[in-house]
Structure formats: C-alpha cells, structure tokens
Amino acid sequence: MANMNQYQNIPVEKFRFSQKTDLGHDKKFETKPVSYFQGAFRRFCKNKGAVVGGVIILVLVLFAIIAPFFTPFTPRYQDARYSYVTPKSKLFANSNLEFWDGCKIKDTNYVGYLKDLALEAETGREIIKNDKVTISEDGATYYYRYDTYYGVGFGKYKEITPEKYADIQRYQNETGRQVLYPVVKLSDRPTLEKNKYDANIYYVVEDKKAVTVRPKLDDDGNIIPNYWKYDPDDAPGTVAKYDSIRIEGDEGVPVLVTKVDENGNVVRDEKGKVVKEEKAYYYAYGIQFPSTVQVRVETYEYYIYEHTQELKDGITEPFFLFGTTGTGKDIFACLAYGARFSFIFASVVAIVNFIVGIIWGSISGYFGGKLDLAMERFCEILGSVPTMIIITLLKYHMGRFILENALYELVDIQSAIVLFISFFATGWIGIAGRTRMQFYRFKNQEYVLAARTLGASDSRIMFKHIFPNGLGTIVTSIALIIPSMIYSETSLSYLGIINLEAGNLTSVGTLINAGQEAFQTLDLNKAYVALFPCLFLVLLMLSFNLFGNGLRDAFNPSLRGSED
C-alpha cells in the first residue's frame, strides 16, 4: 500500500518532456484499404476451379442469349422430310475428314445400294460420300457414308396447282436450279400402291409387281431411265405444258416411230413394210389432272423454293448444325431457346425465393421466441407438401382456368406458370432456414451487442452487421439453386409431367426425351439427338458446382487476408 502511495504522489518537478523521436505512432498504410467485396473477388480469382466454372457458365449463358439470333429456325419449326438428319457444319461439309458433314454410316443390301446410285445418277449429287463402299464377306451388306440431306431424294409424287407449277418454272428459269424432274407414266410404274407413287423410282424395274422393286440394269450395268417421252407436235392432253430448264440428256431424245402421211395413214415401203422415222421426243415434267398437276420434285431444291419464294422466313437451305429430331425440329435452335428459357426461369425463381427467404429467415432468426416458433411450424407444414402434388393440381386446375377464360396468349406459357408457382411455393424455405441459422449464429456476438448498445436499429443490425457475415453460406445456396431449378425443370419435362413444347417454348428436357426415343431404335447414328442437350446439362451442373464452392469460400469473412 505504501508503494502505491509512493507512485501516486510523484512530484511534478520529476516529470520531463519527451523528445518527439521517442513518441510511438502507428505506421501509415502504404496500400489502399480493401473492401469486403474486393477481398471476396480476390479470393474468388485465386480459386482456379471456380474461375473455370464461371467461364463455362458465361459461355453457356452467351450461347442461350446470342445463338437464337444466328439461326433462322425456331422451336416452332419442324419438317418431317428432314427427320433425323445428322449434324452438318459448312467447315467440314466439303472436307475429307468424314466428320460433322451431314453423313451417317449406312448399311443396306444390294437393292438399297442400287437405289442410292440411281439417285446420284439422276441428280448429280454425292449421296455416297467419296464413293467409298465396303461390302461384307458374304456380299449381303453394303456399308458407306450416306448423305442424309441429299439422300432424301424425291419422296412421293406431289400434286400442286397449275399456278404453282408455272411459278416453279419461272423460279427455275431465273435461278437455274432444277426443281422439277421428269415423271414416269402411270402405266409404266410399279403396281403396288407404296411403289406406284414413290417418286424415287424413275427407272425400269425387273418386276413391277414385286414388294421391293429392283432396278433393271443395261449391259453396261447402268440404270435405265423410265421417263415418259412424248412428241411435242402431238402431245397428249395429260402432259402438263413445260417451258423451263430440262435435265441433262433431255435435248430431244431420238425415237423411232411409225411414219404417217398428211391424212394420218401409215406409210409403207415398196415391199409393204411399215416405214420408221426418227423423231425428237421430250420428257414430261408433269401429269395434268382436272385441277392439279402431278410432279416429281427433288426435296432439297423444293425446300429451298418453298422457303425463299413462298414462306420467305429467312431459311435459305436445309442446314442443321446439330442435326434434327425425329419430328424434324432443329436441335441447335431448340437447345438455344430451351437454354435461354431455363436460365431466365431459374434466375427469376431463384431471385424471388432469395428475397422471400432472406426476409423470412432474418425475421425468424433475429427475433426468435414465439414468433420464430410459429414461423418454423408454418415452414414445416408447407414444406411437407410434395412438389409433385402441387404441380399436378396446378397443371389441371390452372390449365382449365386459362382455357375457360380464353386467355389464348397465356396458353403457351401455362406450363411455365405452373412450374414457377410450384417451385416458389416451397423453394424459399431452404434459404429461409439457412438465413435463420446464420442469424442465430451471429446475433449474440460482441459487435452486435455493441451496435445495439450504441442505439442501432433492428433493421440496421440485421442487414448491416449480421447478414454480411452469413452471406457466404447464403450466396452458395443461391448459386446452387439455379442449377437445381434447371435440373428439376429438365427432369419434369423429360418425364413428360410438364409439357414445355408449345409454340416457341421448349426445354432441354424435351430434347433429351427426343434423344431417348432415338435410342430406342438402337441406331447409333441417332446418338447426336441426346448428345448435345446432355452435354449442355452436364457442363451446366458441373460448372455451377465449382462456381458455387468458389463463391462460398470468397464470401467467407474468416478467410479475409488468406489470399495474401
């Protein structure tokens, strides 16, 4: 005690002013202060996996936004004539790489091989790629790369109006593109109905009554055309008038006919034999019916004519970068539109769930007590309702309401509205639970008590002091909600529970379902139908997983300074 008094009663004269050099000062920071978000960004950039995931997500998002503007096709488009045509890129179409060139490996018998050769001979197109053919050891099967675009050939005979018949001739004369090809006389065609109107059969066949007709070859092994030839000076009334470009070899076919005089009598020589003369005959390009003209049109050129002259929809040729489905839908366009819908839908649902969940969870966790108990019981009751039941009830009852009220503009988005309500009904509960947990964790910390002591309002404490510390966990949950929503929506549309294939609306799951249908045929040439949507989904899920983990670590305040 005496010692303490001794120190307390120090005489003033014993004090001396210190030198300025003895004073201790905090060193001035040489660097600028780093904010919370700047530090989070630095930590995120040091996570290579998260950066790669973010880049992949950015590429997928840009694909969903930009790709629809670079294709004339839409999900509404479909053309059964070009079903299951393989992916084709202009970069590889004319190369010898045998990759992404619109071809597939075809295995067929000798008759099928002859039919493809016949199409090549008539149209001049390379249907058998590079003329490379492999024959099995027993000689029964032929293997070759088959062009799925040109191999469509002519399909069935078409009946068109005389006006359209004349317009096609006008188009041919202007462009020099051959759309119309010579027809075969009805009496010269195969007998069976399916073969009689098969426009690909333009040649002489061995047996007209056979189920599978076989081309008849000449002595040199060539296809024998069976076109309808007529005398232009005495054309039958059933031959439609034709005044346009003709195929090669139709410059007046020399035919030996019976010579007749001016009165129509047969001319005979001195020995009484019928005199023959050579006349120039031409091929018939249309069969005239009372109100229509029956024609043979090459599908590839007729497709171009339809879209450039009639529909004028911006489509210039049948060209599908990712191929087509069994119904003739363009996979590239459907995937782009489906991805765009998935991103927009998942983002909207995630944002709404995030806002509602944050508000609900923060109130529940901060105030606690009976209010927290009541709010938690409500969440448990609501969360116990299966999402599938909500979807089913909304699908039937809400769909009926839309149709009965004649809101036709909403019919196309009926399924999207049902999905939104279903995912929102219980989707925010998980975020609310995580937010509540974070508020319980931090609300009794010293800095929170200090802020309350200094008079900070509840809202300031909640969103200024507590919320930023729990942001890492919450943001991670948001980053994983988006792919989860996309995956759920894809699964429901894949299973057919929700139909998003209406108008210009489509889904990645619908494409995967189309791929499954293609696989049921056990044809590996159709694997591309499922390949592209599945690849998109796999990249999306993996990249969001990496991205979410990176965000969690970046927004974790306990890691502040760890990047130094």
Predicted regions and their residues:
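Membrane-topology segments of multi-pass transport proteins
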Residues: 1-46, 69-327, 564
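Aromatic-acidic/polar surface patches that form glycan- and anion
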Residues: 30-33, 48-51, 536, 540
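Short, solvent-exposed loop/edge-beta patches enriched in aromatic
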Residues: 45-50, 340
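Alpha-helical transmembrane segments of integral membrane proteins
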Residues: 48-58, 324-564
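Short, strongly hydrophobic transmembrane alpha-helices
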Residues: 49-70, 358, 538
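Residue-level signal for pocket-adjacent positions within structured domains
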Residues: 64-65, 79, 316-317, 487-492
